[in-house]
Design a protein with these regions (language model features):
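Extended, subdomain-level signal for the structured scaffold at the beginning of enzyme domains
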Residues: 1-100, 113-160
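ADP-ribose/adenylate-binding Rossmann-like module
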Residues: 101-108
Length: 160
């Protein structure tokens, strides 16, 4: 499939307290290297504290930042944060809308509880190549895949 690239595009990163700081840094670097931007979405407008104690300012609050605003999304959560997202309609909708719009979705393993609450498999990458585990694959690989802009196979798989 053609790969127009991710330059000029926007990655929405849904971030919770305790999310892995190294994964966030790698995503930011890989996105910048492709000429794209990152927008941080947090459960509250004040931002979050990531795993190394750094306070990360939110560009958007979850309730006002649906995944439709982004070309691709990533979910960086720790278990407690993922459970909190799963309990919120906006958290579940963020995921289900991204799936419905055939977006590439990067995630860390703690997001499994959010996927389950949204009615998805807890390991969605086993059935859908549009999901990329950032716990298993480098951020640069995820961003390169995002250059395809959409994972259209998902739409074809659900149409039949």
């Amino acid at each position: 499939m053609d790969n127009p690239g991710f330059a000029g595009r926007k990655l929405g990163v849904l971030l919770t307290n305790g999310a892995d700081a190294e994964t966030l840094a790698a995503l930011r670097a890989a996105t910048a290297a492709e000429g794209a931007t990152v927008e941080i979405i947090a459960p509250a407008v004040g931002g979050v504290d990531v795993s190394d104690g750094t306070r990360v300012r939110a560009d958007q609050q979850l309730d006002g930042a649906p995944s439709v605003l982004y070309d691709a999304v990533a979910i960086l959560a720790e278990p407690g944060g993922a459970r909190a997202l799963a309990a919120r309609p906006a958290g579940r909708d963020f995921v289900t809308d991204a799936v419905a719009h055939c977006k590439f979705i990067g995630y860390t393993s703690a997001a499994a509880v959010l996927f389950e609450a949204a009615g998805l498999p807890t390991d969605p990458s086993s059935a859908d190549d549009g999901f990329i585990s950032l716990s298993e694959h480098p951020a640069a690989e995820f961003i390169a895949r995002c250059g395809q802009l959409r994972y259209w196979h998902r739409e074809f798989a659900t149409a039949g």
